[in-house]
Amino acid sequence: MNLIQRFMRVFFNLFYHPFAFTYDLVAATVSFGNWKDWVYSIIPFIEGTRILELGHGPGHLQRILLDRGLDSVAMDESAPMGTLAKRRLGSSHKLTRGLAQKIPFADEAFDSIVSTFPTEYIFDMQTLSEAHRVLRNSGRLIVLLAAWPKNPLLGWLFKVTGESPSDARELIKSKMKMAFARAEFKTEVQIVEVKSGSLLVVIGKKEESKC
């Protein structure tokens, strides 16, 4: 693990735990006010009615899914995030605390699993294996992995650094495809263009058992 990776791990640990109360403000700032819209953009990819969200954060997506009448449950490792989400959802919440590497639900329990802007746990083979286990045949694992805002400041920054969003996209797409394939998902990667930016969505489909 290099120095940058160590720094990011420490940063996210602080961000999701003692400083979880700053999540909405920070997310809105780095996305130029588009964070929630980006999160909601994953909804059209969801199939079925029994949904699991990995890493629910402060509960914005859960609120929408429950309001739409879906049987949605969610889990997050962070206790502070659970507190924020419970405040938002009230008595309607179906939240549990736990690790994505040890999903506490039965085999083939869900039609779709969603995760928006997850940290490195989503690349863990144990996470992907667990997701595969709890999905029904033809179920979907849908991950909103990254977003690139359409903002003049960022365009200038990419010119200065000599990098481009397309370089980052290809690197992330390659990494996710390899991870999903190892977990026996049929994988599709989409770049979703919205008014405020470009979103990278990875969809892993659990193919029907041949048995």
Segments (PLM) and residue ranges:
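Conserved class I S-adenosyl-L-methionine
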Residues: 2-46, 60, 156-162
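Class I SAM-dependent methyltransferase SAM/SAH-binding core
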Residues: 52-102
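A short acidic, Gly/Pro-enriched loop at the edge of an enzyme's catalytic core
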Residues: 101-112
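A short SAM/SAH-binding and catalytic strip from SAM-dependent methyltransferases
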Residues: 112-125
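A short glycine-rich, Lys/Arg-flanked "PGG" loop and its adjoining helix->strand segment in the class I
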Residues: 126-137
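Core SAM-dependent methyltransferase catalytic element
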Residues: 184-185, 189-211
